[in-house]
C-alpha cells in the first residue's frame, strides 16, 4: 500500500462467515439501521401544556442558575443541575422527525419513557405508563390509583400512553424503527411496590422484590450506592422474586403488542437493556425468548461495556452497545501521546469481529459516545484518557469543557466516516451532528440545539454547526446508498503506521468499495489497489483514479471499484 521503509500489513480478508451458531439470526432490518439516541427531556419541547414544574427555558445559558436554583444552598454540581427539567416530550419528537429523516437515520433508541422523576427516567416510578410530562401531563396519579400492579387486566391506557403509541405509528409510517430503554435492574423510590415495602415492611406483598439488608432500621441496596435506585433482589437464576419477574414479562408484552391481538406492528421494535450484566444470564435467556415469542423480528441490545461473548452466542441479546469499537476508534483517531497505530486498531477490531458471530457483528450498535460518556468532540480535546474515565469537570479540574477547536471537529468527522463505513450499525448521540459538546454527566445532556430557536444565550458558542450537519448527512447518505457498507464483507487492505493510514474494503456481489482513513497530522500518499476507482467521498465527481493518490490530514476518502 505504501513505499520505502514504512510497514505495510498483509491484506486480511474477513468474510463474516457464520460458524459459531448456524441457527443464530438477527433482524435483517437491524443490519440496515443507522441509529440515533434520544434523551427525550433534552431533545425538543413540542408543547408547554405538559411541562413539569419549573421547566427551564430551552435557550437559557447552561451554567447560569434559574431564580429557584441554589436557594437552599446547593451549588451547580451539588446538585441542582441534576434536577433540571426542560420539557422535552413526545410531541417534540414527532415535530422533529423531519430533522431525523433529512439527516438520514432510520432507527431511534429512546432513553427511558416510563413514568419517573427527574430528566433521565432511569428511576422508574411505573413501567405500566409513559411519563406524563412526555405525553398529556397530569394523567398518571388517577390511573395508578385504579390499577392492581400485578393484574394486567386492570391496567388502563392513559392519554400519555396513547400519545406514545400514536408516535410509534407515525414514526413507523415514515420508515423509522423505535426501541426503548428497559431498566429492569432497579426502580425509583416512588415505584408502587417499593412504596408498599416502605409502608408495610416485611409484611408487604412485595417484600421479596427488593434487596433489603435490614428491616429495623430499614436499609436496602441501591444501584451503585444511590438510595434513590432500589435494586431488585437477585438469585443465581436472575430475579429472586417470581412475581417481580412476572411483572417485567407482563409489561414487556404490553409495550410490544399494545392491543394484545398477536400483531406486534403497533408496538415498539425492541429494547436497549440497562446494566443487564447485573442480572444473571438465565433470566435474560428466558426474557429474550419471551420477547421473540411476541415479535420474532424484535431487536435486543444490551449495555455491556466490555467484551460480550457470553451475551452474544444466540441465547440472549442480538447486540450490545459497542463500546469496544469506540475505545479503539478514540485510541487511534483521538489520542496523542498514547495513540495506537492503525495496525493495532486493525488487529483489535479484527479480534472483535472474530469473537462474535457474523449475524451479531452486522447489528452491533457502533457508537462513539452516549448519555453515559463525555461528548465525542469533547473527548477529542481531552485526549489520552481511558475511555469514560476522568471526564467529569466537577471531579477533574484538568478536563477542558470549553467549546472544542476546529481540529477536534475535524477528528470528529473522521470518526463519523469510520462509523458509517465500518461493519456494524452506526449510532449517533443526539446533537453530535450539530456540534454539541460537553464533559460527562451532566454536561453531555444539554438541550438540543435547533436553528429555529436561535439565538441562544451565549450565542457566540451555542448554534447549529451547519457545515458539520451537512457532513453527517453526506456520510449517512453514503452508507444508505451502498448496501455493501451495511451488509457487505469486510477486508482489511492494509495499514501504514508511518503515515497513520488504514485502508479497508466493503464488498458484496454487486460492488466493492474502498475506504482510506488518514488519522495523521500530515497529508498522506498511498497507492490504490490495482484497478480503477471512482471517487464517492468527499466528492462523487471526477474520473476514475488509480496508482498513487493523496489524502489530507485527519480525513478520509472513499471509492467505488469500476467493474
Residue ranges and their predicted role:
Residues 1-19:
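Extended acidic/polar, glycine-enriched regions
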Residues 30, 46-80, 85, 306, ...:
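Loop/helix patches that line or flank the sugar-binding groove of alpha-linked glycan CAZymes
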Residues 30-33, 40-106, 113-265, 287, ...:
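Substrate-binding/active-site clefts of carbohydrate-active enzymes
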Residues 34, 545-563:
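C-terminal beta-strand-rich structural cap/linker in extracellular carbohydrate-active enzymes
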Residues 168-176, 186, 195-201, 251, ...:
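Active-site-proximal helices and loops of the catalytic beta/alpha 8
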Residues 530-540:
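Solvent-exposed beta-hairpin/edge-strand motifs
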